[in-house]
Amino acid sequence: VMVQRYLEEVDRKGEVSLVYFNGVLSHAVEKAPMLHPSFKSTDEIHEEIVTAREPSEQEWLWGERVRKAIHTLIKEVSGRDIQLLFNRVDVVGDGRGGFYLMEVSLIDAGLYLGASPEGLDNFADAIAQRVFGWAARCGGGRPTRGSGDTMARLELLGAGPNRVSS
């Protein structure tokens, strides 16, 4: 269960989610209001409506401040300079030029990969960077077969789109 303070801004405009892979903004989505009385649904479960869009400069700056704070904390606690594979920062405008931080998702984040044309490719690239970066650090190097795109590299690992797991 997550408990958040009620904000009229959420009912009026919804939220903006900024999705990061390996510390780099991948994409942003706008989540439409869901619980406002004007939201009509006949289902008991409300479908979340998300639309990909470019974040405003202020949204980007706010999200980047949050991401940097998380990265700094990880460095201080772990002693390692490492970015999270993924995280999501949800913000809502406060109507005065600032933002409310609504949620930071670090573990089970909804990444809205289907809402953004580049989202899935960016996530696959982030995973490939981790896998091949780790292999290079362990002396394995990077595979040379293929065109260099993510799908070709994943295919070498047996994880490409044409593989079926049993």
Where are these regions (language model features)?
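Phosphate-binding site of ATP-dependent enzymes
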Residues: V1-E76, V92-G95, Y100
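Short, solvent-exposed secondary-structure boundary motifs
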Residues: E8-V10, G79-D81, S165
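Serine residues within intrinsically disordered or low-complexity segments
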Residues: S147, S165-S166
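Short, intrinsically disordered C-terminal tails of secreted or membrane-associated proteins
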Residues: G160-V164
